[in-house]
């Protein structure tokens, strides 16, 4: 399936498996300072054969280096934008988009983006040695070094601790003082098309739950377009349930498919409940 590439702005959650972009086309907005967050929903993709991957070599972790952030930005550009390979200066355009996403990602994860308490870029990576020559394009675009070996970012999402995401439906939980620190949203969820059907989306969401719990988050949200059945299935199987739907007039005004807001209650840690 084509992964949602969730919006942070890349849609909140819509990006995990590549739904069309947030405006209803097959692309999705980059999450950059001047643009809204992007989400790409998961879309089924039956024509892609899942490669044989040693799943024990997956590492799901928060990005800790600029090299890894750059690789994640390149994966998002590759996932959220349908670019004609034969177009003039296509490589220059891809790099331009990646640079914008990279700078926006650095701004968010460093705590400099107004309105966000904290943002983590969570990536799924594989050793370069695990990927065959048939993955040359992916490896070339999304490779980085962790200081020990070369690895490739094959999935990514943002965990955003904030009240709401720009131009998106806001969650209602928790209420009261907790809204300032205990609510989070997933966005820019994406998985390389070559690695679909390897459980990467579930691994990313599971990791985001653990990180959110460490932050004291009690309520996690994600957005998904109403017709993205694959994305909804992914989130529902991960424990999310529908809280509300975007008003049709708002979707028309923003010139995009109508979205659903999904909610997940996270267990309260013993320390938090004392």
From Swiss-Prot:
The active site is at residue 235. One of its GO terms (cellular component) is chloroplast. Acetyl-CoA binds at residues 189-191, 197-202, 228-230, 235. It comes from Arabidopsis thaliana. It is found in: Plastid, Chloroplast. It catalyses: an N-terminal L-alpha-aminoacyl-[protein] + acetyl-CoA = N-terminal N(alpha)-acetyl-L-alpha-aminoacyl-[protein] + CoA + H(+); L-lysyl-[protein] + acetyl-CoA = N(6)-acetyl-L-lysyl-[protein] + CoA + H(+); N-terminal L-alanyl-[protein] + acetyl-CoA = N-terminal N(alpha)-acetyl-L-alanyl-[protein] + CoA + H(+); N-terminal L-seryl-[protein] + acetyl-CoA = N-terminal N(alpha)-acetyl-L-seryl-[protein] + CoA + H(+). Gene3D superfamilies: 3.40.630.30. Expressed in green tissues. Pfam families: Acetyltransf_1. This is GCN5-related N-acetyltransferase 7, chloroplastic. It is an enzyme of class 2 (transferase). Oligomer. One of its GO terms (molecular function) is N-acetyltransferase activity. Protein acetyltransferase with dual specificity triggering both N-alpha-acetylation (NTA), with a large spectrum of modified N-termini, including methionine, alanine, serine, threonine and to a lower extent valine and proline as substrates, and epsilon-lysine acetylation (KA). One of its GO terms (biological process) is N-terminal protein amino acid acetylation. InterPro entries: Acyl_CoA_acyltransferase, GNAT_dom. Autoacetylated. Residues 1-65 form a transit peptide. Its EC number is 2.3.1.255, 2.3.1.48. It comes from the Eukaryota. Keywords: Chloroplast, Plastid, Transferase, Transit peptide. Belongs to the acetyltransferase family. GNAT subfamily.
